[in-house]
Structures are given as C-alpha cells and as structure tokens.
C-alpha cells in the first residue's frame, strides 16, 4: 500500500493523528543522526531530505548530524589504505583523518545539503571546526576490559550552542559533519552518534533520533523477538555490555542525551522510507524509545 492508494478519509485520519505531535514539537529542536542505508539508497536519501524540509515547514527545528562510515571505507579502499575498527569506533590515523575530512564534509555533507535545498533554501553545511562549534577531547575504547587507543578519535567536550541557535533563528537546517579540534587545535574524527547526543543535550532538544539499519534495540541480537519498543536508561545501562559493537556508540549517545535532559531518544529503522515522520507523527512509531529511569 502506498499513499496514492489510500482513500481520502484514510489520508485525513493520518493527518489528524499527527496533530498531537505537531503541537508538541512546534518550535522545538529535534536532532537527527543520519547514517546507514538511509545515506546510500537514493530513494531513502531523497525521502530523508523531504522529511527535513517537512519538519522545517511545520515550525519544527531539525538539526542533522551525519556520519559517513561506508563512504569513508570505500574511499580508503580506493586509495589502498587499510582501515580498522575497535569497540565500534574507526581507528583513525592522520592518513585516515585526511580521508575522513574529505569524505564527510566534501562529499556526504554536500550531497545532503543539496538534497534538502531542492525543497527550498534551508540547509547549511558545517563541521565542528566552524565557529568553534565543537571542542573535542581524545578518547579510547574498552576492548575486552582493556582501554585501547584508537588514534585521532574524540568525544565532543563542548558545543557552541549559540552558533547553532543563530542558524536555527535564521530558519536554517544545520547539517553537521563530525570533525572537531581539541583544545590544542588537533582535529579529531568524532563518532556521529556521540556527537548527535552532545548536540541534543546542548540545545535542549525535545528528541534525539538515531537512524540505524535494524528495527531498533534488541536485548539478545540476533533474536528478532527480543526487540524492545521502550526502555529506560537504567535498563539500557545494564544491557550495554551485551550489545553488538556497532550498536554501542548509539546506545552511549542515547544514554548521554537522556541523562543530560533530552526527554527521549529513539533508535529507528533508517531502511523505512520517511522513518523520521513515522516516528515523530504516528502513535505506533518505529524502533525503540529511550526514556529516563
């Protein structure tokens, strides 16, 4: 079934159901981490861009934080550079960082900005290096109980919220590539999941949405019957050690955002067309909702 096959009455019911959520979110910031298949499938990319324009025209303030893992990996392969992951994070040498900067801002960010701007002059591409938007602090990861160095990888230590709010006040949609200098000016690669959480916390966002390539959070992956629709931060912290490595940054991001005051974080299936609108404006939603304990 598509929207074209719905009866006029059914379409009206869909719009009426959205009213409650439109009222709740009007004038509020929603931070969306854009990644996974939604970045590589043309239909999903265009649907995501349309969703951002829809939010903007409903008086909601979307802020997009994007990754670029598949594109970085592809470019590293073309250049003959070996890549590695530890604890769900990309090991970033100076050589890998150069590629990440080129791909994140020069390719992925530009493509998304152009797709959104096909609907109007809304999107502005920035990195954490612009206007001192982010300040990074270097991080390690825990691998089998051992703190492990992963190179030029950081967490967001500070967000220049005023700079982002200036863009929002100008009715723009910030599209953020996750690169940021530390206090000494050394640029780091920032995981987009953890960066999105820092942005949501700093802006006092109403919601944080994480796009993934699965239906949501599973308590016992790959058992699909273990999908949870809602979980609180206490239960999620207990679940964290058992999660698949690639899900760890997303869960860490959800925990940071919700414990930092964001009312809810949502891990949603980015393979679903218009997944952002489904999650925000329908009673059923899609994926897993994380709330405070």
UniProtKB/Swiss-Prot annotation:
Known catalytic reactions: N-acetyl-L-glutamate + ATP = N-acetyl-L-glutamyl 5-phosphate + ADP
Major location (coarse): cytoplasm
Matches recorded under HAMAP family: ArgB
Transmembrane segments: none
Pathway: Amino-acid biosynthesis; L-arginine biosynthesis; N(2)-acetyl-L-ornithine from L-glutamate: step 2/4
EC number annotated for this UniProt entry: 2.7.2.8
NCBIfam families documented for this protein: argB (TIGR00761)
Source organism superkingdom: Bacteria
One GO molecular-function entry: ATP binding
Protein name: Acetylglutamate kinase
CDD domains: AAK_NAGK-C
A Gene Ontology term for the protein's cellular component: cytoplasm
Site residues, Transition state stabilizer: 33, 250
Binding site residues for substrate: 68-69, 90, 189
Gene name linked to the record: argB
The keyword Nuclease is assigned to this record: no
Protein function: Catalyzes the ATP-dependent phosphorylation of N-acetyl-L-glutamate.
Keywords on record: Amino-acid biosynthesis, Arginine biosynthesis, ATP-binding, Cytoplasm, Kinase, Nucleotide-binding, Transferase
Compartments it resides in: Cytoplasm
Biological process annotations from GO: arginine biosynthetic process via ornithine; L-arginine biosynthetic process
């Amino acid at each position: 079934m598509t929207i074209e096959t719905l009866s006029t009455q059914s379409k009206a019911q869909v719009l009426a159901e959205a009213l409650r959520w439109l009222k709740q979110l009007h004038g509020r910031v929603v931070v969306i981490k854009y990644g996974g298949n939604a970045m590589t499938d043309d239909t999903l990319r265009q649907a995501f861009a349309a969703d951002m324009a829809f939010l903007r025209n409903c008086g909601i303030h979307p802020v997009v934080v994007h990754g670029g893992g598949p594109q970085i990996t592809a470019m590293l392969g073309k250049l003959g550079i070996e890549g590695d992951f530890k604890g769900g994070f990309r090991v970033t040498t100076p050589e890998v960082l150069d590629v990440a900067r080129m791909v994140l801002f020069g390719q992925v960010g530009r493509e998304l900005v152009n797709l959104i701007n096909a609907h109007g002059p809304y999107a502005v591409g920035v990195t954490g290096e612009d206007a001192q938007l982010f300040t990074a602090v270097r991080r390690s990861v825990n691998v089998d109980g051992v703190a492990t160095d992963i190179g030029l990888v950081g967490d967001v230590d500070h967000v220049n919220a005023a700079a982002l709010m200036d863009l929002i006040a100008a009715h723009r949609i910030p599209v953020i590539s996750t690169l940021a200098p530390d206090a000494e000016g050394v640029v780091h690669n920032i995981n987009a999941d953890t960066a999105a959480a820092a942005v949501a916390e700093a802006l006092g966002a109403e919601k944080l949405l994480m796009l993934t390539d699965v239906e949501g959070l599973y308590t016992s992956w790959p058992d699909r019957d273990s999908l949870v629709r809602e979980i609180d931060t206490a239960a999620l912290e207990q679940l964290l050690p058992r999660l698949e490595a690639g899900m760890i940054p997303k869960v860490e991001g959800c925990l940071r955002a919700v414990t930092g005051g964001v009312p809810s974080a949502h891990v949603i299936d980015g393979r679903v067309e218009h997944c952002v609108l489904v999650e925000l404006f329908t009673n059923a939603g899609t994926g897993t909702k994380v709330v405070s304990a």
